[in-house]
Amino acid sequence: MARYLGPKAKLSRREGTDLFLKSARRSIADKSKFDSKPGQHGRTSGARTSDYGLQLREKQKVKRMYGVLEKQFRRYFEAAESRKGNTGANLLFLLESRLDNVVYRMGFGSTRAEARQLVSHKAITVNGQSVNIPSYLVKTGDLVAVREKSKKQGRIAEALQLATQVGMPAWVEVNTEKAEGLFKKAPDRDEFGADINESLIVELYSR
């Protein structure tokens, strides 16, 4: 399955919620009505969605939100299932621990896609070492930073300014002047803030 390269707002409308695929510079909420799906008949109400349909839709939504394809998403679920604790919460923690997501959460990229590009282009270091793997799992205590030669990029400064205005999550501590941040702790489930029902995903894979 190839990565989706079409309009990002269309994906958010399809899922009925903001997937945070667009920069805060032009919020999807200002341009799209999430209660209608894309297409000519998007506003028409259809038959009740089956339990399987709801579970599948939730999985698709989370995959698109984090930019993860099916095979890799399945591996995350299997890893979450093998850990102690709640499988759904474990799954979200693994997704949140991805380097591209941490870069996004720290405000170095205005979207996860932009953060993924920064990682792939070797603009990011972890504990002083260059890491260009977006799926790299950041650990508690890791220091994530923008490389010195990349700090001059205007998009990074703009993203940091926006993130500072919106506010950053409690599990990261960012020094905006140095463009570096500490991954302080594993986020609690109620700190994610996203409209996710991970239990539906667990039910889907448990079939």
Curated annotation (Swiss-Prot):
Pfam families: Ribosomal_S4 (PF00163), S4 (PF01479)
InterPro entries associated with the record: Ribosomal_uS4, Ribosomal_uS4_bac-type, Ribosomal_uS4_CS, Ribosomal_uS4_N, S4_RNA-bd, S4_RNA-bd_sf
Segments of this protein annotated with the region Disordered: 30-51
GO BP of this protein: ribosomal small subunit biogenesis; translation
GO molecular function: rRNA binding; structural constituent of ribosome
Lineage top rank: taxon: Bacteria
Gene Ontology cellular component terms for the protein in this record: small ribosomal subunit
Domain S4 RNA-binding per the UniProt entry, residue ranges: 97-157
SUPFAM superfamilies attached to this UniProt entry: Alpha-L RNA-binding motif
Record's keyword terms, sorted: Ribonucleoprotein, Ribosomal protein, RNA-binding, rRNA-binding
Database matches in PANTHER family: 30S 40S RIBOSOMAL PROTEIN, SMALL RIBOSOMAL SUBUNIT PROTEIN US4M
Subunit details: Part of the 30S ribosomal subunit. Contacts protein S5. The interaction surface between S4 and S5 is involved in control of translational fidelity.
Family that this chain belongs to: Belongs to the universal ribosomal protein uS4 family.
Protein task: One of the primary rRNA binding proteins, it binds directly to 16S rRNA where it nucleates assembly of the body of the 30S subunit.
The protein's name in its UniProt record: Small ribosomal subunit protein uS4
Native organism taxonomy: Bacteria, Pseudomonadati, Pseudomonadota, Betaproteobacteria, Burkholderiales
